[in-house]
Curated annotation (Swiss-Prot):
GO molecular function term, any single one: GTP binding
Source organism, top-level taxon: Archaea
Enzyme class: transferase
Pfam family, one: DUF359
Name of the molecule in the record: GTP-dependent dephospho-CoA kinase
Species for this entry: Picrophilus torridus (strain ATCC 700027 / DSM 9790 / JCM 10055 / NBRC 100828 / KAW 2/3)
GO biological process: coenzyme A biosynthetic process
Amino acid sequence: MQLKFDHDLVLNQESINRIKEFSHSICSIDDIKKHGGRIITVGDVTTENLERAGLDIFIEVVDLKTKRGEKTYNHRENSISIENRPGTISLSLIRAIESSIKSNKKTRIEINGEEDLAVIPIIFYGDINTLVVYGVPDTGMACIFINTEIKSMVTDILRDLNGKT
């Protein structure tokens, strides 16, 4: 089912709990190298680590800082810059992810605010067999392999947040 979005989505506790149910695994760079398919990253440290390892990243979603403020990152030319408040999935983030995936071109999305929830629209718009890699503070990297089951779960969450049936 195709959803149409016309406003920012604000997460509630129920949605947060449902998101925590996602089937992800802690993964290493070697695990990611074995994937061989499209990779989308969320987070500056994760993106930097995969770039250093020579991995080909299709879409990068970053906020130019780390959670603990240990390091900041620089803006890159030709990046898409958007706003996204903590606890929300802004309409501009949704549109940037949708257009980036549909364009089939490598893209960097730089967020003023928080990038953590970008995983949700990435899964919604992402192709089956895409690997989404994001950072888990004090733990490492987590991987979600997009399949029909996780897409269905995300669609349900977005439908509820969007207030449409």
